[in-house]
From Swiss-Prot:
Molecular function via GO: (3R)-hydroxyacyl-[acyl-carrier-protein] dehydratase activity
The reaction(s) this protein catalyses: a (3R)-hydroxyacyl-[ACP] = a (2E)-enoyl-[ACP] + H2O
Listed name of the protein: 3-hydroxyacyl-[acyl-carrier-protein] dehydratase FabZ
NCBIfam families per the UniProt record, alphabetical: fabZ, PRK00006.1
Keywords: Cytoplasm, Lipid A biosynthesis, Lipid biosynthesis, Lipid metabolism, Lyase
Superkingdom of the organism of origin: Bacteria
Organism: Helicobacter pylori (strain G27)
The protein's role, per its UniProt record: Involved in unsaturated fatty acids biosynthesis. Catalyzes the dehydration of short chain beta-hydroxyacyl-ACPs and long chain saturated and unsaturated beta-hydroxyacyl-ACPs.
Length: 159
């Protein structure tokens, strides 16, 4: 049953994120949610460190965090917003659901992300109907937009 969780807490730490999202190392790309308004918007971040495995090959002498992983982090953030908007913080329901990426539109990469950056994801709900959610927003470092995108996802039963 779809419902709205307007009184949801606004901050979530890694132990909370791990209970809602199925992603794990090295593909969990959110460290903390710092702002969440159900059905409206979310702000989360990932600290980028030189210890990321991806820097072994992207690129050894000039480490740049891959754009596709920035978009994946935005998608995970949007998925967290969609799930918690529908069911609140409910780890038991999270075990039965999965968010599938459907489309990526209007992606632009503006500034490289490098070790030491705090990559913030700022997303807002563009529209949703049932289990289909469309979100859009930016990835930022120090208040500067490094990437932007619109994403569509579907929440389904995990089998």
């Amino acid at each position: 049953m779809e419902q709205s969780h307007q009184n949801l807490q606004s901050q979530f730490f890694i132990e909370h994120i791990l209970q809602i999202l199925p992603h794990r190392y090295p593909m969990l790309l959110i460290d903390r949610v710092v702002e969440l308004e159900a059905n409206r918007k979310i702000v989360a971040y990932k600290n980028i460190t030189f210890n990321e495995d991806v820097f072994n090959g992207h690129f050894p002498n000039k480490p740049i965090f891959p754009g596709v992983l920035i978009v994946e982090g935005m998608a995970q953030t949007g998925g967290f917003l969609a799930f918690t908007s529908l069911w609140g913080f409910d780890p038991e329901i999270a075990k039965t659901k999965i968010v599938y990426f459907m489309t990526i539109d209007k992606v632009k990469f503006r500034i490289p992300v490098t070790p030491g950056d705090r990559l913030e994801y700022h997303l807002e709900v563009l529209k949703h109907k049932g289990m289909i959610w469309q979100v859009g927003g930016t990835a930022q470092v120090d208040g500067k937009v490094v990437a932007e995108a619109e994403l569509k996802a579907m929440i389904a039963e995990r089998e």
